[in-house]
């Protein structure tokens, strides 16, 4: 799942980090999976896994405020379900915290 998130978000050309950002860019994205569970059981085997993903988009200039919509739309286009967002502010950066849900269906054998 981590690789899928990276593959999708890298296309934006914005610095990307898992859990913690150590760079010095004026805008960057941090992501993490805050919950993961098996789902849709049949014959004692799960048919899918559900991932709960947090995306934090940080930016210094308010001219970038709409980029969070690009992030949201891109993830939705790639099968992620948007589950809410809130505004952030920390250490001179503005931010947008976004939650997504992704259901990964296991392939039939």
Descriptions of predicted regions:
Residues 4, 25, 42-47, 88-90, ...:
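Compositionally biased, intrinsically disordered low-complexity segments enriched in polar/Pro/Gly
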Residues 45-50, 71-73:
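Short intrinsically disordered coil segments
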Residues 69-109:
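Acidic-leaning, charged glycine-interspersed low-complexity segments
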Residues 1-41, 60:
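Small/polar-rich, solvent-exposed N-terminal microdomains that initiate assembly or binding
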Residues 22, 38-40, 51-55, 75-81, ...:
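Short, surface-exposed linear patches
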Residues 5-10, 67-75:
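Short amphipathic alpha-helices in soluble, non-transmembrane regions
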Residues 49-61, 94-104:
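Oligomerization/assembly interface segments of phage tail-like spikes and tubes
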């Amino acid at each position: 799942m981590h690789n899928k998130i990276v593959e999708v978000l890298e296309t934006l050309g914005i610095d990307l980090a898992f859990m913690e950002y150590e760079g010095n860019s004026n805008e960057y994205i941090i992501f993490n999976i805050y919950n993961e569970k098996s789902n849709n059981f049949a014959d004692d085997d799960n048919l899918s896994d559900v991932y709960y993903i947090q995306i934090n988009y940080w930016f210094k200039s308010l001219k970038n405020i709409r980029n969070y919509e690009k992030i949201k739309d891109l993830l939705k286009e790639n099968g992620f379900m948007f589950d809410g967002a809130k505004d952030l502010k920390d250490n001179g950066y503005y931010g947008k915290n976004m939650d997504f849900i992704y259901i990964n269906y296991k392939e039939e054998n």
